[in-house]
């Protein structure tokens, strides 16, 4: 299975619940739908503006360097629950201020837990991506082998730094309790539908057609390459 072909569960109206720090750049940037960008001459009161989530440098008493366990973290709520198959950590444009390493944990929670509940010691997390090294200005894909259904992801970075985007690819598994008594769109991605096959996705994926968000630009629709006789039609199967 190509995990990158699976839907991004975080992009389906996901949100950012909490973070240990966001001194240099806001945690919400992690889930922006646009590709990361960088403007070299753009500064604010805190320095160079980065399109991502960036924490301050961690220091111990007297300015000592952090030990190997020091970390920052961010918790995101998936737009729809699902079985996570891969996580992608993108450090685009973070070249001297990227984290040395990362790991990821997952949780399955009912309802809408508060940030305080998600960060409480009693809240249970399962490691799904062991600690792994990162490099700057690069996309890092980590395969996830757990077959469990999750609602929240916690990304840990060691010891601090910046991440441009977070992607969580997997299979949508909606909560039946949220659909009970409702008339739902059975062809909607957020209700568990998906693209079974397609003739072509040269320019963009047919999954855009069943995604919940309205298209902002042409690239957020489905477009195939030009066809000539004898084959003159494209198709997708939901």
Protein language model annotation of sequence segments:
Residues 1-68, 85, 93-121, 143-236:
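Juxtadomain low-complexity/linker regions and immediately adjacent membrane-anchoring helices
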Residues 78-80:
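A short glycine/threonine-centered beta-strand motif
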Residues 113-141:
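Beta-rich interaction modules in large eukaryotic scaffold/regulatory proteins
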